[in-house]
């Protein structure tokens, strides 16, 4: 078994008494997500897509030691995971580029079901900062 799979299994088994409380917290987060938009007068949230720059090939392979990989994944997915839990409408658009020419994503998230708002925003962003033709110096085919 790969270190990642074994590590996750061990972590969840060691914390199985916390599962009910964790599931309840996740459901509360999901339920409160949309109301936060109305309460704060927010249409769209803007965050980075990832918590770190693009990783090198193999840095997040399931064969990497569990503790190392866990820290990397938690940092990398810090912004996408909550949106997945909330069931939020989200999109990633490449609005910036690294010195190596790799895209840096900006994540826009709306209320659940607000896909149309995000598609309209994507059209405006693409018109203002076209990205369709931008490719890094090396492209895998």
Please place each PLM-identified region on the residue numbering.
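Sec/Tat-exported extracytoplasmic proteins
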Residues: 37-41, 129
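Short, acidic Gly/Pro/Ser/Thr-rich loop/turn segments
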Residues: 53-54, 115
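Short, surface-exposed loop/helix-turn segments at secondary-structure junctions
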Residues: 20, 40, 55-77
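Structural helix-boundary/capping segments
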Residues: 20, 84-141
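Short helix-loop capping/hinge segments that flank enzyme active sites or metal/cofactor-binding pockets
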Residues: 1-34, 43, 48, 52, ...
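Small-aliphatic-rich amphipathic alpha-helix that forms the alpha element of a beta-alpha
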Residues: 32-35, 68-93
């Amino acid at each position: 078994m790969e270190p990642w799979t074994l590590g996750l299994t061990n972590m969840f088994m060691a914390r199985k008494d916390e599962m009910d409380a964790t599931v309840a917290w996740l459901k509360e987060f999901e339920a409160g997500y949309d109301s936060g938009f109305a309460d704060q007068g927010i249409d769209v949230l803007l965050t980075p897509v990832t918590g770190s720059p693009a990783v090198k090939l193999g840095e997040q392979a399931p064969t990497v030691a569990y503790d190392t990989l866990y820290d990397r994944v938690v940092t990398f997915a810090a912004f996408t995971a909550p949106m997945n839990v909330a069931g939020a409408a989200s999109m990633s658009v490449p609005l910036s580029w690294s010195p190596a020419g790799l895209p840096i994503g900006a994540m826009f998230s709306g209320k659940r079901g607000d896909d149309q708002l995000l598609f309209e925003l994507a059209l405006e962003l693409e018109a203002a900062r076209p990205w369709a033709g931008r490719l890094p110096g090396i492209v895998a085919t």
